[in-house]
Curated annotation (Swiss-Prot):
NCBIfam families: tigrfam_recA. Can catalyze the hydrolysis of ATP in the presence of single-stranded DNA, the ATP-dependent uptake of single-stranded DNA by duplex DNA, and the ATP-dependent hybridization of homologous single-stranded DNAs. It interacts with LexA causing its activation and leading to its autocatalytic cleavage. InterPro entries: AAA+_ATPase (IPR003593), DNA_recomb/repair_RecA (IPR013765), DNA_recomb/repair_RecA_CS (IPR020584), P-loop_NTPase (IPR027417), RecA-like_C (IPR049261), RecA-like_N (IPR049428), RecA_ATP-bd (IPR020588), RecA_C_sf (IPR023400). Keywords: ATP-binding, Cytoplasm, DNA damage, DNA recombination, DNA repair, DNA-binding, Nucleotide-binding, SOS response. One of its GO terms (molecular function) is ATP hydrolysis activity. The keyword Aminoacyl-tRNA synthetase does not apply. This is Protein RecA. It comes from the Bacteria. GO terms for cellular component: cytosol. The lineage of its organism: Bacteria, Bacillati, Actinomycetota, Actinomycetes, Pseudonocardiales. It is found in: Cytoplasm. One of its GO terms (biological process) is DNA recombination. Belongs to the RecA family.
Amino acid sequence: MAATPDKGKALELALAQIDKQYGKGSVMRLGDETRAPIEVIPTGSISLDVALGIGGLPRGRIVEVYGPESSGKTSVALHAVANAQKLGGTAAFIDAEHALDPEYAKAIGVDTDSLLVSQPDTGEQALEIADMLIRSGALDIIVIDSVAALVPRAEIEGEMGDSHVGLQARLMSQALRKLTSALYNAKTTAIFINQLREKVGVMFGSPETTTGGKALKFYSSVRLDVRRIETLKDGSDAVGNRTRVKVVKNKVAPPFKQAEFDIIYGIGISREGSLIDMGVEQGIIRKSGAWYTYEGDQLGQGKENARKFMRENPDVANEIEKRIKEKLGIGAQVDAETADPAPVDF
């Protein structure tokens, strides 16, 4: 039904009043202008960037990373922090678990000298600090590790056996209502690391659930389920884990894709290993028996030798990464060591 001239005029007056009161762009027609592509922060694994559909974690959104203990949740978050810093951004880490290892963070590539770290006493303090940092508009990424450790003040000050049903869920719900718009306006990515619990008496379906109530599930634009699927060994010594990440929720691209990559102890996600896996899958790297070749040049016999060759020849790794991203249409290469810092828009 077409709008009458009177209705159209009334609407224009209302829109003018809204723009005057709340700022230009507060209300707009969906077809007026094309939306800018979603800005991203690379994860450090090209296979995970591809699974996310846009080339990394979306800026201005909430991301939940959950999984069993020692599955690689913090490693994934720290790689995102390192990549944000390489792009010239500022990062913060709310260490509610008081378990951040600075040496491991540095090995992953995090600039620990400029990383903002807080070890709060209560959940309220943690979320208030996060809110103030986000509203400053100067932050590109913030990690909260973990939701389970955001203990409400009443629980800390109470007796050990006291019942505090639903306190943490209410705290999270209230905080996320405040944080969502602030994150969007500041283009800050918030990564909430979460733990798994088991629901008692579940007969059908998965008994696993995450802590902190249901609010985080709703407010998250991306939810990543991180699982360790295999132990990597050098002879009889364990040197790392094979990790599978499933994108169980994705508001910015099709969900339910998954990625596999290696996490090497003391080093983090093997970028070269991910490039080899994706290169073979996309036909950019040729695998014949145990040998890997690229453009007729041998990378090595066996994955470990190919990985070592690419680590020693970063130009080859960067070229392969660029070709994979161009073929899959997920944006430019951004996490090369030699890349110039990109300007940061707030």
